[in-house]
């Protein structure tokens, strides 16, 4: 039986740790020390690392973790220093007895990857709870295609993104769709969780489809908001581009 633990680091990052009672894999280790403490406290051996993209808050712990474990498999984009199993999407990674489909999801970065083994989706900074990542390298069309690919996963998929941005994302989502009752209900639930010091993650794909404006670019309310903020047509990529630009200055 595998358990999933989010380890908080920095101001709002999580390292995701999937583990049984002997072995663990970790996703996007931005720091080594918190992960080392977690492993030591439970007597776990680190079996593999998965990396979604090259930004330092997702990779800063790689060097220390690998130095202590020569030969440790590190999967991720080729440009990430420390990756020794480079991936581009379309591969399968086997770890902890599970097969993870490697998905190319460009947008936030051009070589961003996600890892899916039901029910878990480790999606880095592509899909957030009620949001999506900034377009640092990719185009709106690429991000729209990537998010559409993820949104097609089963509704019970657990969305394990890397940042605790949920409350700020929900505030923006309500501005986009003020009439969405699911959004109001979700915000109440997530505010209560944060008030108790609990993470809002993982989310579910069904909840994202109901409340995430970037997965709802065909909804009339989202289209209307996008038109009001500069969308020149109603295509999914143009709607996403308009609301993402709005969010960048919200």
Question: Predicted segment positions?
Answer:
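Conserved beta-strand hairpin/beta-sheet module of binuclear metal-dependent hydrolase folds
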Residues: 1-42, 113-128
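Active-site HxH/HxHxD metal-binding segment of metal-dependent hydrolases
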Residues: 10-11, 24, 31-103, 189
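Core dinuclear metal-dependent hydrolase active-site scaffold
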Residues: 17-19, 92-116, 121, 152
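Divalent metal-coordination and catalytic microenvironments
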Residues: 18, 28, 53, 105-108, ...
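Active-site metal-binding loops of divalent metal-dependent hydrolases
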Residues: 29-31, 54, 79, 108-109, ...
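A short acidic, helix-capping loop that chelates divalent metal ions and anchors anionic groups
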Residues: 83, 130-136, 169
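Active-site-adjacent loop/tail segments of enzyme domains
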Residues: 131-157
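Accessory terminal helices/loops
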Residues: 148-157, 167-250
């Amino acid at each position: 039986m595998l358990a999933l633990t989010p380890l908080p680091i920095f101001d709002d990052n999580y390292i995701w740790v999937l583990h049984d009672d002997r072995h663990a894999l970790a996703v996007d280790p931005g720091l080594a020390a918190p992960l080392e403490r977690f492993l030591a406290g439970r007597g776990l051996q680190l079996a593999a690392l998965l990396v979604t993209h090259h930004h330092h808050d997702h990779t800063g712990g790689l060097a220390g973790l690998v130095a202590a474990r020569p030969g440790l498999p590190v999967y991720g984009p080729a440009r990430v220093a420390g990756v020794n199993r480079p991936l581009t999407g379309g591969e399968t990674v086997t770890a902890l007895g599970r097969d993870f489909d490697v998905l190319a999801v460009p947008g936030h970065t051009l070589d961003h990857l996600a890892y899916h083994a039901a029910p878990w989706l480790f999606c880095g900074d592509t899909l957030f709870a009620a949001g999506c990542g900034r377009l640092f390298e990719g185009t709106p069309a690429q991000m729209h295609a990537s998010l559409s690919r993820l949104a097609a996963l089963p509704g019970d998929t657990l969305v394990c993104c890397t940042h605790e941005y949920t409350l700020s994302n929900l505030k923006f989502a309500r501005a986009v769709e003020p009439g969405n009752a699911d959004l109001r209900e979700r915000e109440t639930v997530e505010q209560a969780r944060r008030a108790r010091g609990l993470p809002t993650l993982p989310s579910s794909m069904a909840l994202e489809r109901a409340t995430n404006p970037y997965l709802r670019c065909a909804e009339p309310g989202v289209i209307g908001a996008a038109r009001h903020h500069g969308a020149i047509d109603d295509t999914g990529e143009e709607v996403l581009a308009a609301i993402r630009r709005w969010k960048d200055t919200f």
